[in-house]
């Protein structure tokens, strides 16, 4: 199995296809297999890359929680892009992977062509932050004490997962099987040191305002923890656009693969053609008629 040593750990990866590179970064409950519908589609025209984050076998599973963190995850991603000579790559992330994608755009913009930030926002809303951090710590504790088979089944039935179960029972069953094969230790460390500890999106506002990379923000309309923060990202990143998937939860690339692939393909095509726009500052006016300058 192909692996590469990056940032002090061994990470498993797969490359399929040839052309302009696209790298996909998985969510907490996923792994490299979560991107199969995208690899089958995009590898016909692009070089596609998937990998398992640290803590997700067959990648290395460090024992110490201090070996995990948002900055570490971002350094891992940048390291893979550089080591595999993918720069600059289109970068597509879901949930935890979307946070890493966004942080890559802030810290390593030179290695990216564009960013797709899907299902991003959990734990960012100020009124929900304490609850999210408590839930994350409790989930980590139970993963360690009760194991992935029991807790993974509970996690897979969360309020933003049932949409996938309803739409595609076979795909959902495969998602659960893959989740239950994860490392309890790696998942607990990831939940505790990355999910619970990462900064709120709102804490990044000043840096996001300066970001110049073309950015596509995606979420399901029933992925409640992401909706408010996605509007914040749209308002804050001057080169961003947002699309919301109807009747959809969290894993939108698996729930609605055709729609996801079509929207991302159109975005990447516009970027590669130099046609992705920067927002007109007048579009931020709260008036439906006058720009801020006109109304003062």
Mark where each language-model region is.
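Catalytic active-site module of serine/aspartate enzymes centered on a nucleophile-bearing elbow/loop
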Residues: 240-296
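Active-site loop/oxyanion-hole signature of alpha/beta-hydrolase fold enzymes
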Residues: 39-40, 49-92, 96, 262-265
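Conserved HGGG/HGGXW glycine-rich cap/lid loop of the alpha/beta-hydrolase fold
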Residues: 9-66
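N-terminal cap/lid segment of alpha/beta-hydrolase-fold proteins
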Residues: 1-10
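Conserved alpha/beta-hydrolase "acid-adjacent" motif
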Residues: 224-229
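Short beta-strand/loop motif that positions the catalytic acidic residue
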Residues: 211, 217-219
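Flexible "cap/lid" loop of the alpha/beta hydrolase fold
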Residues: 102, 106-107, 112-146, 150
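Conserved alpha/beta-hydrolase catalytic His-Asp/Glu region
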Residues: 126-131, 145-207
């Amino acid at each position: 199995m192909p692996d590469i040593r990056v940032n002090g750990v061994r990470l498993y990866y797969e490359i399929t296809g040839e052309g302009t590179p696209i790298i996909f970064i998985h969510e907490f409950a996923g792994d490299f297999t979560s991107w199969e519908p995208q690899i089958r589609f995009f590898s016909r025209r692009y070089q596609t890359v998937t990998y398992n984050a640290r803590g997700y076998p067959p990648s290395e599973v460090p024992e110490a929680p201090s070996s995990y963190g948002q900055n570490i995850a971002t350094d891992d991603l940048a390291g893979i892009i550089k080591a595999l000579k993918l720069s600059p790559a289109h970068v597509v992330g879901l949930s935890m992977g979307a946070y890493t994608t966004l942080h890559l755009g802030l810290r390593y913009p030179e290695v990216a062509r564009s960013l797709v930030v899907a299902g991003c926002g959990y734990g960012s809303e100020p009124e929900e932050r304490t609850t999210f951090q408590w839930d994350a710590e409790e989930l980590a504790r139970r993963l360690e004490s009760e194991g992935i088979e029991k807790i993974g089944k509970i996690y897979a039935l969360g309020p933003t997962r049932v949409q996938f179960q309803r739409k595609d029972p076979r795909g959902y069953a495969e998602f659960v099987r893959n989740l239950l094969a994860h490392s309890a230790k790696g998942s607990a460390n990831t939940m505790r040191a990355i999910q619970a500890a990462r900064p709120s999106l709102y804490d990044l506002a000043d840096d996001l305002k300066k970001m110049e990379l073309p950015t596509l923000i995606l979420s399901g309309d029933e992925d409640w923890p992401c909706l408010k923060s996605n509007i914040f990202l749209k308002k804050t990143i001057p080169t961003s656009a947002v699309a919301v998937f109807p009747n959809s939860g969290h894993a939108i690339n698996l729930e609605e693969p055709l729609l996801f692939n079509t929207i991302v393909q159109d975005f990447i095509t516009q970027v590669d053609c130099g046609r992705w726009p920067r927002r007109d500052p007048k579009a931020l006016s709260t008036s439906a008629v006058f720009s801020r300058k006109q109304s003062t």
